[in-house]
């Protein structure tokens, strides 16, 4: 058979078989199996070379924009309990100082400048720290008369190293919407620890008296005596008193049923209250003299553990200390502050020992995150030489006089005495602690009043 005829028969056979459905499916399956075998061969080769094929989902993740990857990384670095977008303690507008705490700060700050409150803080029974805690209790949404109301405070930030001097609960009584009217019997308000029969304090209200709004203050010092301090729950109760035995007019009218008691109608309801009218627990403590920087490091370390990121000092032993480095902006502020106030050499250093200006700006130090007031103050510093003969106003010690004399005879053998503060005074600071509580504290030795040679 010649070649043209063979080719013609082959074309005819192929066209005939192509019209059969089974031949098309067999061809597709054969192609798929070939592709699978090819892919398998490639996978084996990739595994040998340390490469793996990525699924479509993995490929999509690999194409994630850099910003998304950065957010995921930051989320992994965020401490437990801090959600994305949550502000660290002491930042933003979440903590609003209560007017009572602001008034305390203003009063004592003015008194410090006038020098009239020294005896208050030097007394053995007085406080140098005042901490405020805002009520965290929930509203009672029931429609029944509210005869008892609980107030809950988180006092875990109080240190057992501090001496408890006093504590008070401040409740703002709103003006009742309507007068009570008869009967003319007293109304008793009593404060107890929750689940305890211990009466902490009591007040008597006159329902027929003036219905002016104002603060009711209860002494709760006994309720805070048990330690350790974690949570403090206080319960306010109301009860009608007995008629006065001398009120003959009321008795002549006969027995009258008093209206049902409801703390809401008395002005003690929680609903529709601005922040400045919420219940406030004020604790007065006396702490031992403590180094400011040590105490602030503890405060910042606690705040960092509660959720601050990227701007607070790393806690000791932190496994990821690198992620808690100060922000570049804060480093620039500190560098600028150091360069502006760190030059103490040259001609001025040859002046005699005296007090020089030193303006402290807490914002430049990066402390404005948690310090409310003051944001700046004049600390002063001592600078100059202590050469022979020493002036009497420098109040030198006998040792400083001898040391200065030896230095004048042989400067190489004995260094000169140093120009240091001889009298320091305190300042008041209002700040936010690690629990987002507003704290007033008087810090000793913050302002140089006089300098001398020592």
Swiss-Prot record:
Query: In which residue ranges is the amino acid composition biased (Low complexity)?
Result: 81-92, 303-319
State the source organism's domain of life: Eukaryota
* Effect of deleting the gene: Mice lacking GDF6 display photoreceptor degeneration. Animals exhibit abnormal electroretinograms with up to 66% decreases in the bipolar cell-driven b-wave and 54% decreases in the photoreceptor-mediated a-wave amplitudes, as well as 3 to 27% reduced photopic flicker fusion. The lengths, but not the widths, of dermal flat bones in the skull and the digits are significantly shorter than in wild type. GDF6-knockout mice also shows cochlear aplasia, while the vestibular anatomy is normal.
Upregulation: Strongly up-regulated in tibialis anterior muscles after denervation.
Keyword match Disulfide bond: yes
Query: Can you tell me which residues are glycosylated?
Result: 117
Q: How does it assemble?
A: Homodimer; disulfide-linked.
What does the function comment of this entry state?
Growth factor that controls proliferation and cellular differentiation in the retina and bone formation. Plays a key role in regulating apoptosis during retinal development. Establishes dorsal-ventral positional information in the retina and controls the formation of the retinotectal map. Required for normal formation of bones and joints in the limbs, skull, digits and axial skeleton. Plays a key role in establishing boundaries between skeletal elements during development. Regulation of GDF6 expression seems to be a mechanism for evolving species-specific changes in skeletal structures.
Q: What is this protein called?
A: Growth/differentiation factor 6
Species this chain originates from: Mus musculus (Mouse)
Source species taxonomy? Eukaryota, Metazoa, Chordata, Craniata, Vertebrata
